[in-house]
Amino acid sequence: MSKLISYAAKNTLRNTRLGANPICQHATRDYMHLAAASAARNTYSTPAVGFAKQPVLRQAVNTVAVMGQISRRSMFIQTQDTPNPESLKFLPGVDVLGKGNTYDFPSGSAAHCSPLAKLLFRVEGVRAVFFGGDFITISKEESGEWGLIKPEVFAVIMDFFASGLPVIHEARPNADTEILEDDDETVMMIKELLDTRIRPTVQEDGGDIVFMGYENGIVKLKMQGSCSSCPSSIVTLKNGVQNMLQFYIPEVESVEQVFDDADKMANKEFERFEKSLMQKESVNQPNAPVNIGGGTPN
């Protein structure tokens, strides 16, 4: 948030836009390559176990495993905390989607185009997955424990990148900030500022921000990744994003966070869980002393 405010005070609006390069193309034989990477490290992630152990394919798997071993030796995955305690940022040391590109997977059903996302959702306790230029943000269930989830995520990431498979099967630029023919000057400036100043800063915290619309001076944005359920997301929007947009674009009056059906359901469940905790605490608290005499207690 402080970075956004300092940017607003020091920087001028750039007129150049980040180009979106194709991320990858369709890949074949996903599981064979993944099994080979698993064989290289002598452990098998869930989808690779059955495949790699088939006798007919053993020779092919072991042949490719040498390449997987070489790739894995050079991979060192780091983790970084995010403002959201339920989300953790994983830095594999290699490009995930490439600079400026992001992809949000709020649930396993949205991971149809990404072999890596599918594998990560198979880790018990993983609630959501988010890909950035050079990082992966994992959001866990409230009941999940990072001590159990992190080793599994490490194994999946190592296996996957050693296999050489594409992260997603289709290129996907940031369509929300693509300049359209019917965009007026204000909308164009908002999209430009989001892409060049705001989005990179939010991505540093393992999340992303998506432009949803502009009407009557109100900019509508959707938070993704670690920012989607972060307790400080409203503060970030109001004190960081809104201040910067208003600094450069006087037409902007306010910023509103947009929630989809999945977000609303998650927030409702969280409120219900929080309410049940408060009720349990009130039941467990000892009763206050009763003043039988009616006078002022000592």
From Swiss-Prot:
MF-aspect GO terms: iron ion binding; iron-sulfur cluster binding
Keyword set includes Protein biosynthesis: no
Protein name: NFU1 iron-sulfur cluster scaffold homolog, mitochondrial
Gene3D superfamilies in UniProt: Fe-S cluster assembly (FSCA) (3.30.300.130), Scaffold protein Nfu/NifU, N-terminal domain (3.30.1370.70)
Region (Disordered): 279-298
Any one of the GO BP annotations: iron-sulfur cluster assembly
Keywords: Iron, Iron-sulfur, Metal-binding, Mitochondrion, Transit peptide
Assigned GO CC terms: mitochondrion
Similarity field: Belongs to the NifU family.
Biased composition regions of type Polar residues, renumbered to the chain: 279-288
Span list, region NifU: 190-258
InterPro entries, A to Z: FSCA_dom_sf, Nfu/NifU_N, Nfu/NifU_N_sf, NIF_FeS_clus_asmbl_NifU_C
Entry keyword Iron: yes
Highest taxon listed in the record's lineage: Eukaryota
Functional note: Molecular scaffold for [Fe-S] cluster assembly of mitochondrial iron-sulfur proteins.
Cellular location(s): Mitochondrion
Sites where the protein binds [4Fe-4S] cluster: 227, 230
